[in-house]
Amino acid sequence: EILAHSLYVESTNSTFQAKSAEGSTLDGLNTHLAIIDELHAHKTRAVYDVVETSLGKRVNSLMWVITTAGFDTSGICYEVRTMVRNVLNRSVVDESQFGIIYGLDEGDDWKSLAALEKANPNWGVSVMPEVVTSLQKKAIAIPSAAGNFMTKHLDVWCSAASGWMNMPAWNK
């Protein structure tokens, strides 16, 4: 049955529905699959924590987090990213964690086509090269646009302290 804000399958008593972005309203969930989109935009860890806790009520439950980089390196997204990186580089063993991080490595030239392709595994499929290369050119020409471009299209974490001012141009 397809409802306005959910799907319901009577034969399995299963429901698929979007939930509130307010963690305080989510207590009591019994989650089999949770998809948290754009974790970098979460101001607090409340939703992440209540959803993660709700996974303990079912066998083989799964929480899938999808996000780009962001600007808040003190938030839940950067914390989760750090944990995933530690699992991937084997400095932490946690069989409950699996992750894939597409982005640039230190030393990669963010202005190159290779960087765009590396950070965007769906390049040319759902990521439109002509759009992203145009945005890249804008970010190169307008340094104040570089931080947003790098977080959204190259998965590079930037902060307000990151200097994207074109100092050679400033000094002229």
Task: Give the positions of each predicted feature.
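Walker B catalytic acidic pair
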Residues: 37-38
